[in-house]
Regions:
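General beta-strand structural signal in soluble alpha/beta enzymes
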Residues: 22-24, 61, 126, 167
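Conserved FAD-binding catalytic core of PHBH/FMO-like flavoproteins
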Residues: 88-131
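Acidic/polar loop patches that form or flank catalytic/metal-binding clefts of enzymes
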Residues: 79-80, 97-101, 159-167
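Flavin (primarily FAD) binding-site architecture
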Residues: 61-76
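Generic secondary-structure signature for well-ordered alpha-helical cores
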Residues: 16-21, 33, 72-75, 94, ...
Length: 194
């Protein structure tokens, strides 16, 4: 078990030390293909809503919920992304005794299931749900999500209930209509889905 935020910060720090430049808050609004033989070797120009233009040989499409929209910018229509909402609930630290290991059920077709997970901070996380939605921006936690999680979790560990919740979180995962992850090169040279 790792701290996801600490892990991402560490990966970003290593990338920056190796020359990666991060451009935050830059919504991609267009990708133009460059004619073959450009002097700088560029194949594409990525355009942002703030007017930035980046000439590049490669585009790695890691846009998550919007990766289908980014792929469409270069004429690819190979997949559709639908958001899958997951809610998780953090329990009070006094519940840390219930497990030191991840407790997980048999996975379903759409999810690894609802887990009981100890965190690096010695709290317990319960969840997530896996609910398909059309809203790519909805990060709300719901009474239905809470009910779903705790009715399931209480069967695995009778000592856990929703009265021990100290925080709740919701996120959206990208679920492709292909039934699998979309990773690899595409028909557009230099455009890679990740």
């Amino acid at each position: 078990v790792v701290s996801p935020s600490e892990m991402v910060h560490s990966l970003a720090a290593v990338a920056a030390r190796n020359g990666v430049e991060f451009l935050f808050e830059q919504e991609v609004v267009g990708i133009d293909q460059v004619a073959a033989g450009a002097e700088d070797g560029a194949r594409m120009v990525v355009k942002t809503a703030k007017g930035l233009e980046v000439r590049t040989r490669f585009v790695v499409n890691a846009a998550g919920l919007f990766s289908d929209k980014v792929a469409e910018m270069v004429g690819l229509h190979d997949f559709v992304i639908k958001p899958r909402k997951g809610e998780e609930y953090l329990l009070d630290k006094n519940m840390s005794y219930v497990t030191k290991r991840v407790i997980l059920p048999v996975p379903t077709k759409v999810s690894k299931g609802i887990l009981i997970t100890p965190t690096v901070d010695e709290t317990i996380m319960c969840g997530p749900t896996a609910v398909d939605t059309d809203d790519r921006y909805d990060l709300t936690c719901t009474p239905e999500g809470c009910q779903t999680i705790f009715s399931f979790v209480s069967k695995m560990c009778t000592e856990i209930n929703d009265r021990q919740v100290i925080a709740s979180f919701a996120g959206l995962r990208a679920a492709a209509n292909t039934g699998d992850f979309i990773i690899g090169p595409t028909a557009v040279k230099g455009f890679i889905n990740a």
